[in-house]
Curated annotation (Swiss-Prot):
Composition bias type Low complexity, residue spans: 50-67, 129-141, 309-318
Species of the source: Streptococcus pneumoniae (strain CGSP14)
Disulfide bond sites: none
The keyword tRNA processing appears for this protein: no
Region (G4): 541-544
Pfam families in the cross-refs: EF-G_D2 (PF22042), GTP_EFTU (PF00009), IF-2 (PF11987), IF2_N (PF04760)
Domain (tr-type G) ranges: 432-599
Main localization, broad class: cytoplasm
Protein name: Translation initiation factor IF-2
Length: 930
């Protein structure tokens, strides 16, 4: 008979599939889902159950349809013995079965059930073993019969074996199906399947109904309270409105509490939650084993159901807790909806380039999405984290009606701004300041002697080699007025120091010896002063010498643009003798006169700014810097930034070595307290606090490092040849240590200017201070030697230098350092050799000796032929071979040389093609001194 699926029956009746499934279960049918199939008679029975007329019949005889349907199903499958056993049992009515589904399951004796199942499995396993043994004996018997039968019965045996295997497989499949049907019936009887979808739908409908009832009650209460509040607040003050609103809210809460205390009576709901059912495990038997090995075991459906039941139970528990929490939340009074505050737009907006949309939105108190939309309408695609340029920000502010102003950001690390800002100085606080005078001129023209005379001390006698090594800053008093003097070196190596002195000075005193006249450094000093736009006072010194000629000096200076006022120029000329203190007062009066004409003024009320004159490292004090205060007043404990360093002024000393606490404009002082020694010529400035000074100093150091890295020379087509050529040069590595920063600069510049073809100077390291162990370690690693200028090595450094074979050269005069370095560079060059011919000889006879070679008998016709000389073989005026002698003999004796007019024999190394009348030219290579 044909079968029908439940969803087909539902489609014919116009019902939903789940209704048909539920009706089939009510009729006692074992169906699982809408895709389950039933016989046509059962389908007709299900269809008839939906008709009103058929309903009484079903109630009168509930068990009759099921019994008939089961009998029909059993007749359709007569081969199943398990079904036949079921026929013998009395038919159970359907109604009691449906009652079991709704009722609570009774307690079971699981221990007794497990023991019974174990006994059944043991008996079945024993029976299967006997069957397998009989089958094995039959198989062995068949094999023996096949072997005895011969070739003729081979096909018959194969057919019988195939039939036996087929029967065996059919029997196993039959027993397997019977067991499965028994297990399914047993599981259905113990725990019938539950329609979880129907139960979940019922539970959800019940919860929705409960929530709708409670929500409707709360909504009505809220509407009533709102209407009452609106009527009462028509003509009341805001304070009264808020008080009454609070009272009404309390009343609403009380009403809600009463509603919760006295809930309405409802019929108890049927517990539709899924119960955890204990299903028996599947019987494991030996039917899944065959001769070729065990088969893959079937999945344990019971254990899967247990896991699924446990998950659903946990989900229900969590859902229950969540529903309870929501119920508590529903009982609370709803929070009033707060209206969004309206912020007025500012009238002005100060912006900087690179502001993001989010920053602008925060400043004008608008949402970023609103600004993004406006920008989109303006044709600008942007996100809230995107930076905008100044023009876009201005257009955006115009759209909002806000006046946009660009914020001028001040670079806190820029010291130079203090020197150029117009508003830094107070015009009302300006006072007259002392002039800063720089004494410049050629070496040994008497600059330091003049300054010594001015200070009434003997500083000049202490200068090594008669030249000043670094700038000296001093202050004297003349006619109650202070004058600050700077003494600059006159040697050619100190060009940078003279330029630095001219840049901070107000007046330049150009010292020219009356007997020497204008010299190279004199011209250089003139150029520095003109570049700095500084007036020049010419002091013609050494007029006491017999060969003095001041007129010649005036004429030579006029050729270089320094004209005397007597000749219509603007430079004052004073003839002096610094050694004998002649006309010194007149020179000082001239200085004060020129300073008065310049009207030099400063503001002592502002924070101090100025220039570094000199810097050095002291063993006990650390970094020591000589500063010239140009504006403001410098105090002890001031936070200060000097060049790329920073610190706090711990101590100040004047030019006399006395400690001072205050330094006004045009005052030279030495300070301590910096973290590093600055560079001479750097500017300094005092900051408000140490935090800002530290930030500015660190930022300046970072910028200097980045600038140094970016200054690395890159190879291009223009400098490719120079780069390749520099790679072929030899290098002299030098480490320079000096007493002051100015000497380090001068020495480094002078050494790098030394021009020796093929050799260059590489300054590995240069610093201020004594030679220490780290300098020796660096020299050893870089294969360099150390030059100490006015410094000495520490005892530990000296011992380490001797152990590591590092050369240390100490000097106090700069031109001696330059001469010594030039000699060292020339010694680095490869020696040059010149060829010198020492003699000639003619081959008179040749002798060929086996295993030796060709011997040439010769006579010296000019000079001599030496054993260690090189020879050329010349034939018909052409050089045939150039090489060395293998042996030289006079008759049978080995000799070192054969002189003119004598005969001998020779062999040439690597050459045997000597012929008669060949000319042998002997020569040597001599080294040429550079």
């Amino acid at each position: 008979m044909s079968k029908k699926r439940l969803y087909e029956i539902a489609k014919e009746l116009g019902k939903e599939s789940k209704e048909v499934v539920a009706r089939a279960k009510e009729l006692g049918l074992d169906v699982k889902s809408h895709s389950s199939s039933v016989e046509e008679a059962v389908a007709a029975k299900i269809a008839a159950s939906f008709k009103p007329a058929a309903a009484p019949k079903v109630e009168a005889k509930p068990a009759a349809p099921k019994v008939s349907a089961e009998k029909k199903a059993e007749k359709s499958e007569p081969a199943k013995p398990a079904v036949a056993k079921e026929e013998a049992k009395p038919a159970e009515p359907v109604a009691p079965k449906t009652e079991k589904v709704a009722a609570k399951p009774q307690s079971r004796n699981f221990k007794a059930e497990r023991e019974a199942r174990a006994k059944e499995q043991a008996e079945r396993r024993k029976q299967n073993k006997g069957n397998n043994r009989d089958q094995q004996q039959n198989g062995n018997r068949q094999k023996n019969d096949g072997r005895n039968g011969g070739k003729q019965g081979q096909s018959n045996r194969d057919n019988r074996r195939f039939n036996d295997q087929a029967k065996k497989q059919q029997g196993q499949q039959k027993r397997r199906n019977e067991r499965r049907q028994q297990e399914d019936k047993r599981s259905n009887q113990v725990a019938p399947r539950i329609d979880f979808k129907a139960r979940a739908a019922a539970l959800k409908a019940e919860q929705n109904a409960e929530y709708a009832r409670s929500s409707e009650e709360r909504f009505k209460q809220y509407q009533a309270a709102k209407e009452a509040l609106a009527q009462a607040n028509k003509r009341k003050e805001p304070e009264e409105i808020f008080e009454e609103a609070a009272k009404l809210a309390e009343q609403a809460q009380q009403v809600q509490a009463v509603v919760e205390v006295v809930p309405e009576k409802k019929e108890p709901a049927v517990d539709t939650r899924r119960k955890k059912q204990a299903r028996p495990d599947k019987n494991r038997d030996d039917y899944d084993h065959e001769e070729d090995g065990p088969r893959k075991q079937q999945k344990n459906r019971s254990s899967q159901n247990q896991v699924r039941n446990q998950k659903n139970s946990n989900w229900n528990n969590n859902k229950k807790n969540k529903k309870g929490n929501n119920k508590n939340n529903r009982n609370q009074t709803p929070k009033p909806v707060t209206e969004r505050k309206f912020h007025e737009l500012p009238t002005e907006f100060e912006y900087t380039d690179g502001m993001t949309v989010a920053e602008i939105a925060k400043r004008i108190k608008r949402e970023p999405a609103e600004i993004v939309k406006k920008l989109f309408m303006m044709g600008v695609m942007a996100t809230q984290n995107q930076s905008l340029d100044g023009e876009t920000i201005e257009l955006l502010m115009v759209d909002y009606g806000i006046e946009a102003k660009q914020k001028v950001e001040v670079d806190n690390a820029d010291i130079e701004r203090f020197f150029v800002e117009d508003g830094y100085l107070n015009e009302d606080e300006l006072v007259e300041r002392p002039p800063v005078v720089t004494i410049m001129g050629h070496v040994d023209h008497g600059k330091t002697t003049l300054l010594d005379t001015l200070r009434n001390s003997r500083v000049a006698t202490g200068e090594a080699g008669g030249i000043t090594q670094h700038i000296g800053a001093y202050q004297i008093v003349e006619n109650g007025k202070k004058i600050t003097f700077l003494d600059t070196p006159g040697h050619a190596a100190f060009t940078s120091m003279r330029a630095r002195g001219a840049s901070v000075t107000d007046i330049t005193i150009l010292v020219v010896a009356a007997d020497d006249g204008v010299m190279p450094q004199t011209i250089e000093a003139i150029n520095h002063s003109k570049a700095a736009n500084v007036p020049i006072i010419v002091a013609i010194n050494k007029i006491d010498k017999p060969g003095a000629n001041p007129e010649r000096v005036i004429g030579e200076l006029a050729e270089h643009g320094v004209m005397s006022t007597a000749w219509g120029g603007d430079s004052e000329f004073v003839e002096i003798s610094a050694k004998f203190n002649q006309n010194i007062e007149e020179l000082l009066e001239t200085v004060l006169l020129v300073a008065e004409i310049q009207e030099l003024k400063a503001d002592p009320t502002v924070r101090a700014i100025g220039t570094v004159i000199e810097a050095r490292l002291d063993k006990g004090k650390g970094a020591v810097a000589t500063l010239l205060v140009q504006q403001g007043t410098l105090n002890v404990q001031d936070p200060i930034v000097v060049g790329n360093t920073f610190g706090r002024v711990r101590a100040m000393t004047n030019d006399l070595g006395r400690r001072v606490k205050v330094a006004g404009p045009s005052t030279p002082v030495s300070i301590t307290g910096l973290n590093e020694a600055p560079m001479a010529g750097d500017h300094f400035a005092v900051y408000e606090d140490e935090k800002s000074a530290r930030a500015a100093g660190e930022e300046r150091a970072k910028r200097a490092l980045m600038k140094q890295r970016q200054a690395t020379q890159r190879v291009s087509l223009e400098n490719l040849f120079d780069t390749l050529k520099a790679g072929e040069l030899k290098s002299v590595n030098v480490i320079i240590k000096a007493d002051v920063q100015g000497s380090v600069e001068a020495l480094s510049a002078s050494l790098q200017k030394i021009d020796v073809e093929g050799v260059k100077v590489t300054i590995v390291h240069s610093a201020v201070g004594a030679i220490n162990e780290s300098d020796v370690t660096l020299a050893e690693a870089s294969n360099a030697f150390i030059v100490g200028f006015n410094v000495r090595p520490t005892p530990q450094a000296r011992q380490q230098a001797e152990a590591d074979d590092v050369e240390i050269r100490l000097h106090s005069i700069i031109y001696k350092v330059i001469e010594e370095m030039e000699e060292a560079m020339k010694g680095m060059l490869d020696p040059e050799f010149e060829e010198k011919v020492i003699g000639e000889a003619v081959i008179r006879e040749t002798f060929k000796v086996s295993k030796v070679g060709t011997i040439g008998g010769f006579m010296v016709i000019n000079g001599k032929v030496a054993r260690d000389s090189k020879v050329r073989v010349i034939r018909d005026g052409v050089v045939i071979y150039d090489g060395e002698l293998a042996s030289l003999k006079h008759y049978k004796d080995d000799v070192k040389e054969v002189t003119n007019g004598r005969e001998g024999g020779l062999m040439i190394d690597g050459y045997n093609d000597i012929k008669m009348d060949d000319v042998i030219e002997a020569y040597v290579m001599e080294e040429i001194k550079r």
